[in-house]
Amino acid sequence: MASLIWDQFDYLLSDLDGVVYEGLKSISPAPEVLGELASLGIPVGYVTNNSSRRAAAIAEQLLGFGVRCAPDDIIGSGQTGVALLAEQVPAGSRVLVVGGDGLRDWVSRGGFEVVDSADAHPAAVIQGFAPDVSWRNLAEAAFAIQAGAKWVATNSDWTLPQERGMAPGNGTLVSAVHTAVGQLPLVAGKPEAPIFELAKAHFEAKYGVKQPLFLGDRIDTDITGANKVGMASVLVLTGVSTRKEVLGQRLEGRPRYIIGSMSELLEPYAYPRATKRGYRSGSAEVELRGSKVRLVEGDPTSVDALRAACAVVYTSKTPIFGLDVEPALYE
């Protein structure tokens, strides 16, 4: 049975990197789909772990793709991180900022004094990503934390998709500081709850909506985080997470929906339905034969085949390493 996903939801919360754009380029057909959602009256908000850029700059980039977006339609991990800071240290405190101009702006707007050195005796450190973050920046953060400063990280993404490939993300830099100080930060961004809760409260107040659907390309941040707060999630295979990764997920990382591209948000969704020995989704059927997961009909590279295979694996009650999955389903 196929029906539109939108029968159950009234607004979309979407990741940006790997979903709408990759670096400076849009991911087709995201701009067209976002325009169509707008014409249907479906509000769209953006939730990003990128803390280095100002919301206005992101909105301008989206406008360059033909996507209309107000700066306050973007909730970032920098904004959420500052909200966490306010729970940890008094207003007006000195905060050592590791990250870009966008994060520094949020810290200043939050009523804190921005400093760059541990010698300024900051009450807290907030660590976000920027391409020019250096060893010296990380060292100053480590010195301040060792002296007793509270530590907030905007996000823990290990990698950052770029046009030329995958680059180290903020989580990699946070790990470097962790190695030096022997403790872990509070994390504001996905997959932690604060950013989802802030986004939900903001957009429901702004648009009068109640039922969100979260769209993302990363299982470890987008899908896991949405699941953690009880938000329906859809994985789009245009970014980081792969077919193999989604097949092997435990309960906390399993998306409710899987799509190959954003265009499928506007198409009837082929929900997997049980067959005698497996599941069928659209034109594909996958069966469980003992410990073997095998395609019996359809194109193994299709999203239908992946949906059916995931249904077989997820309901088998057998860990993925105990199953022999046909390689064509995930390669």
Where are these regions (language model features)?
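Asp-based, Mg2+/Mn2+-dependent phosphohydrolase catalytic module
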Residues: A2-S14, Y21-L24, S28, E32, ...
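Polytopic endomembrane small-metabolite transporters, centered on the Drug/Metabolite Transporter
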Residues: S77-Q79
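Conserved phosphate/oxyanion-binding catalytic-loop motifs
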Residues: N50
